[in-house]
Each structure stands twice: as structure tokens, then as C-alpha cells.
Amino acid sequence: LLPLAQSEIETHAANWIDSAFAGRILKVDQPALGNDLVERVLRGGYPEAIARPSARRRIAWARQYIDAIIQRDVREVAGIEKLDQLPRFLRALAQTAGQMCNYTQLGGQVGLDGKTAARYVGVFEQMYLLKRIDVWARNRLNRVVKTSKLQFIDSGLLAALLDVNMEEVQQDRTRFGNVLETFVFGELLKHTTTADGDYRLMYYRDADTFAVDVVLENAAGQLVGVEAKAAASARAGD
């Protein structure tokens, strides 16, 4: 199952995606800013993590949860007996969260061939740890042949894998950007499951490296682009 969305945690029923395609951007009465935003992103959406009273205990739970999935669920679902490579491979995937998939390169970091790496990514996808998203293109066939992007689903789990914590973010926000993008992607993914409309999540990147983090497409082919920025303010170039 997917983690909780922020709207579920805060008990707000409105769906952001439905509203955006209807031309209405939802207003937030008390937007999360500064350390409050960082705290939400690092916490993620799993009820068990949210219930922990401290960041240290949330991180400990996240690591135990990941270990349990690898040791129990992966063995049962995928029939993979040699599990020793999976924790290292998952951490390698965490380092490339939000980037395009190159299975040969990813697998090579932990001694796996490209075919095995792709299979393991598929297993993690079944476990709702991450998701591969296609690139958006006007020609639908191009979506098949172009490289997918790898996104983790829960920002709290990603932060635990990367050892990103509040103290680091307060001093240096460099690595927080990828965790924030994961948070935004995860929220949009959850909203697609509760929306009235039918939506696809993709990303955009052209030959000039112009990119959009998330492209939402409805059944009519209409688009909404979403870009996540960790900076305190937006610039015209963004």
C-alpha cells in the first residue's frame, strides 16, 4: 500500500490534481515553510514513522522496515534467495533518485549485470518502494523507447537511505532537493489514486536538457507540469 498523503494526514478531502486540471490551484491556509516543511519531507507518509516522537526513532523504524521488506517480502514475492546484494543496490538506487535509469551502470556499482539490476528494480517497484516513470512525448511510441526515470515513493525512506537529516539540511540544502522532489512526486502519485479523473505521471526532458520534474496528463491529453525547488524563492529562470 502507498503511504499516507499529506491531505490524509491533515484530513483535507480536496484533490490537488483534479483542482489543477479544472483551473483552480488549491490554497493552503497554513503552508508548511522552513523547518516545518523539512520536517514533513524527512518524516514521509508511513503512519508508523509519523507516530514516532523523534527523528532518530523514525529513521530507526524506516531502516527496520526496509530490512523487513528485503528479508521477508522480496524472498516470498520474487523468490530471490541471495539477498546480500539487495541492501547495497537499494542504497545505490537512492543515490540516483530522480534520475534516468541506466541498469548496466546501476548494477555495476554492486556487481550486478544490467538484466539482473532491471529485475531487482521491478521487485522494489512491486514492494511500493519506488516507481519507474516514462518520459512524456507527443508521439506515444517515443514514451516506450526513451529512458524511464526512477523515483522513490516515500521521502522518509529515501532520507533514511541517504542519511539526510534536519541538521544537514539546515547547514547545506544540496541533497535536500532530491528528497523534496521525491516528496512532491509521492504526493502526486497518491492523489492520482483518489482523483475523480484518470491521470498519468510522467516527466519531460529534451535534447537540450530542458526538464520538468513531473508531467501530469489527463485522458484528454491535457497537461500540467510540476517542478520542485528547494530554494526559498522562485526565479524567472525556474
Residue ranges and their predicted role:
Residues 57, 61, 81-84, 119, ...:
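A generic structural signal for residues located within well-ordered alpha-helices
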Residues 111-126:
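Short amphipathic alpha-helical interaction segments
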